[in-house]
Amino acid sequence: MTSSALKNEPKAMNVRVHDGKLIVDLVDGRSLTVPLDWYPRLAHATPEQQRNWVLLGDGYAIHWPDLDEDIGIEGLLAGNRSGESRESFERWLSGRKK
């Protein structure tokens, strides 16, 4: 991959949840908005957990440590929803209720 290609790769700089949507601001000035329901762990999280995120790899991905959730920016741009199976999500959700 050339250095010019790396400069054009999308990177996040800010993340927020508002009105049932995940909003990711990119360093190039774009903002991505997707339904929060695309990511069930985020949809079922408390507002505090939703705000507790860190950028990985200089902004190429977002990690929510309280939720064990990772979202890559390229996947978000491609319209990829959570790839977690229903069974895995149900196990995670039942573990939170204990």
Residues of each region from the PLM?
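Motif-centric detector for short Cys/His coordination patterns
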Residues: 1-98
